[in-house]
Amino acid sequence: MDLIGFGYAALVTFGSIFGYKRRGGVPSLIAGLFVGCLAGYGAYRVSNDKRDVKVSLFTAFFLATIMGVRFKRSKKIMPAGLVAGLSLMMILRLVLLLL
């Protein structure tokens, strides 16, 4: 079972819900829920086959890119810097699973 992957998916999902409650951004909520579900699906696939990292890798790369750009513009650690950093760590972890 890919507990780290499921934890990452839960963090993204609950982070989008928390952000919606705090700021009220519906597009951000929808995008966060979609990406969180996609990360959860990727963790499910990794749980069944350790080498099946395509969905998880795509999701982490997508989030690292989007949130990295947001962090570069805003210079704010929360939430963009945190999510970009966690996504980069997920990418590293998934690449190591392939070795």
From Swiss-Prot:
Membrane topology summary: Multi-pass membrane protein
One of the GO BP terms on file: negative regulation of mitochondrial outer membrane permeabilization involved in apoptotic signaling pathway
Main location: mitochondrion
Matches recorded under Gene3D superfamilies: 6.10.250.1330, Transmembrane protein 14-like
Annotated InterPro entries: TMEM14, TMEM14_sf
Record keyword Transmembrane present: yes
Localization of this protein: Mitochondrion membrane; Endoplasmic reticulum membrane
Domain of life from the UniProt record: Eukaryota
GO CC terms of this entry: endoplasmic reticulum membrane; mitochondrial membrane
Pfam entry (one): Tmemb_14
Tissues where the protein occurs: Expressed at significantly higher levels in ovarian cancer tissues than in normal tissues (at protein level).
Entry's transmembrane regions: 1-21, 24-44, 79-99
Keyword set, alphabetical order: Apoptosis, Endoplasmic reticulum, Membrane, Mitochondrion, Transmembrane, Transmembrane helix
Free-text function comment from the UniProt entry: Inhibits apoptosis via negative regulation of the mitochondrial outer membrane permeabilization involved in apoptotic signaling pathway.
Family per similarity comment: Belongs to the TMEM14 family.
Descriptive protein name: Transmembrane protein 14A
Organism for this UniProt entry: Homo sapiens
Originating gene: TMEM14A
